[in-house]
Amino acid sequence: MIHIEDADPDHADAKVLIAALSQRLAAITGSSGQASFEADDVRGPGAAFLLARDEQGRAIGCGALRPLQPGVAEIKRMYAAVSGQGIGSAVLAALEARAKSLGYEEIRLETRRVNTTAVGFYGRAGYRECPPYGRYIGRPEAICFAKPVVFASV
């Protein structure tokens, strides 16, 4: 069973997961993705940082939600320590539910095209490719996705 809880991105467990994600992303894409994440962006109104824990209380996944523009949230720092266990799906569902409860109309995210595992994961979760936004405009290595919150799982 996976338990999802709110956490601060500076919590020790969160830092370990974020560091593991950064290391994995650097190995896959050549970039850790750290430049596009600020802990303060996922604190406060309209934002969240979630940790996934297993039955023994071990931190096994994380994800963040931040305001991007009015009505639109962005998912950041999605990570599952183990693939194929439902961790990523549980974190994503919790982030989508939170976005809905916060009144967002759309969720967006970015990953790298070479990260085919993430591209497939988001596609299976109902996210569709959208035009690049913000810092991703003009960056052909980036692929952006969007999903209306009305279709988000809750």
Kindly label every feature range from the protein language model:
Residues 2-3, 9-10, 105-108, 112-154:
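C-terminal "cap" of GNAT-fold acetyltransferases
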Residues 2-76, 81-82, 92-93, 98, ...:
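Acetyl-CoA-dependent GNAT
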Residues 82-83, 118:
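A periodicity- and composition-biased signal for non-globular, repetitive helical segments
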Residues 86:
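Glycine-rich phosphate-binding loop
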Residues 90, 94, 116-117:
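Alpha-helical macromolecular-interaction surfaces
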